[in-house]
């Protein structure tokens, strides 16, 4: 039985990590403005750039964006949504998503990440390896959480927020929209908006 076709937006570092997981389930190709058509990245062909999404829609119906820049990732998804693409979630086999959690569309959940009972994760979210989203926590649209960070019970991570590696967002703490939390931080309450 043949695999469904999937466009992967972005062939950079994060895009390649997404591709490793996506290839397990889909027949993948890249779209990337920085690579020539016909190039192969990790054995996956590049079929065009982002400007080619309208033409590629004739052959591909599914797209996942593996670009770490939250705002740019959102722009690509919005453009693709207007063209009629659908956005599956890419979930590593070793990740765990509770059947009682809510996961938006176009999310990437890498190895050993965990989304627990009652947690909610928005659209276009990237959860790196070892990330934990505890019960009743909420992660907004187009957020990015790096390796081994924990969002504790009842905590909220806003839209477009970026959480560095090895961070703890403590119980019922709030990370506002667009905030950048540096590596190794612990957030105990609502933080002022740090941006990069």
What are the language-model segments listed below?
Residues 1-56, 160:
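Hydrophobic, well-ordered beta-alpha structural blocks that scaffold small-molecule cofactor pockets
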Residues 25-27, 43, 84, 148, ...:
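A generic structural signal for alpha->beta connector loops
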Residues 89-196:
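Structural signal for interior beta-strand "rungs" in well-ordered beta-sheet cores
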């Amino acid at each position: 039985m043949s695999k469904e076709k999937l466009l992967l937006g972005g062939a950079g570092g994060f895009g390649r990590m997404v591709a490793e997981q996506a290839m397990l389930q889909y027949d993948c190709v890249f779209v990337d403005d920085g690579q020539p058509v016909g190039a192969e990245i990790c054995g996956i062909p590049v079929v065009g750039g982002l400007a080619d999404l309208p033409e590629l829609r004739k052959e591909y119906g599914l797209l996942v964006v593996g670009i770490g820049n939250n705002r740019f990732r959102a722009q690509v998804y919005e453009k693709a949504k207007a063209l009629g693409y659908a956005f599956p979630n890419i979930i590593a086999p070793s990740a765990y998503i509770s059947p009682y959690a809510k996961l938006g569309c176009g999310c990437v959940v890498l190895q050993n990440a965990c989304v627990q009972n009652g947690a909610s994760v928005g659209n276009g979210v990237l959860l790196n390896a070892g990330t934990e989203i505890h019960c009743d926590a909420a992660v907004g649209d187009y957020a990015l959480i790096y390796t081994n960070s924990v969002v504790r019970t009842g905590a909220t991570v806003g839209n477009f927020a970026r959480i560095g590696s090895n961070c703890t967002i403590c119980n019922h703490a709030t990370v506002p929209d667009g905030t950048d939390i540096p590596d190794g931080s612990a957030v105990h309450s609502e933080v002022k908006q740090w941006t990069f």
